[in-house]
């Protein structure tokens, strides 16, 4: 059964600040059938990978249940200072400043096929940084899966060397 996931995405104008047209995934998360459909779709795309990686925080919402559905490991990518123990850091530039992402040491192994799962592809900057982290660990980015792609922001261009799949495309 096909479900039109776009009807579960609410647009909130001027949030979190004026001029932003925020895509709210809360209605999708609040509907068990739509959420299940989303996870099953993502799992069908990620079935051949070794591990699933997701960024803090909304990548966790889709990456973790997808990994559990496939009985695969889920690895968290977090902002600096949020993971215990020894971590690998990756600094990257944003449009207005810089940021640091972290992953716990030895969570991503050389040769592993990785799927990155996140909620929204906007400018692509954060996910591009995650691809570099994965490749620095010697692993292979096999797929990048998003719930929503905001096509007008052209984030796909930053990820043109990867297999990028979006369940919903909004122009």
From Swiss-Prot:
Keywords: Cytoplasm, Glycosyltransferase, Purine salvage, Transferase
EC number, UniProt record: 2.4.2.7
Location(s), subcellular: Cytoplasm
Catalysed conversion reaction: AMP + diphosphate = 5-phospho-alpha-D-ribose 1-diphosphate + adenine
Pfam families with a match to the protein in the record: Pribosyltran (PF00156)
GO biological process: adenine salvage; AMP salvage; purine ribonucleoside salvage
Tagged with keyword Chaperone: no
A GO CC annotation given for this chain: cytoplasm
One GO molecular-function entry: adenine binding
Known pathway: Purine metabolism; AMP biosynthesis via salvage pathway; AMP from adenine: step 1/1
Family: Belongs to the purine/pyrimidine phosphoribosyltransferase family.
Oligomeric form and interacting partners: Homodimer.
PANTHER family, per the entry: ADENINE PHOSPHORIBOSYLTRANSFERASE
Name this polypeptide is given: Adenine phosphoribosyltransferase
Organism the protein comes from: Mesomycoplasma hyopneumoniae (strain 7448)
Gene: apt
């Amino acid at each position: 059964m096909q479900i039109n996931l776009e009807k579960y995405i609410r647009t909130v104008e001027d949030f979190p600040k004026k001029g932003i047209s925020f895509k709210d995934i809360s209605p999708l998360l609040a509907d068990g059938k739509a959420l299940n459909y989303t996870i099953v779709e993502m799992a069908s795309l990620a079935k051949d990978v070794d591990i699933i990686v997701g960024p803090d925080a909304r990548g966790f919402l889709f990456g973790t249940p997808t990994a559990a559905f496939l009985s695969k490991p889920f690895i968290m990518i977090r902002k600096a200072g949020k993971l215990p123990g020894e971590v690998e850091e990756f600094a990257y530039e944003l449009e207005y400043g810089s940021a640091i992402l972290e992953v716990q040491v030895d969570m991503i192994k050389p040769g592993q096929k990785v799927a990155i799962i996140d909620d929204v592809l906007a400018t692509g900057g954060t996910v591009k940084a995650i691809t570099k982290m994965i490749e620095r660990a010697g692993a292979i980015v096999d797929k990048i899966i998003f719930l929503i792609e905001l096509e007008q922001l052209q984030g796909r261009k930053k990820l043109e060397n990867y297999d990028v799949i979006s369940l919903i495309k909004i122009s």
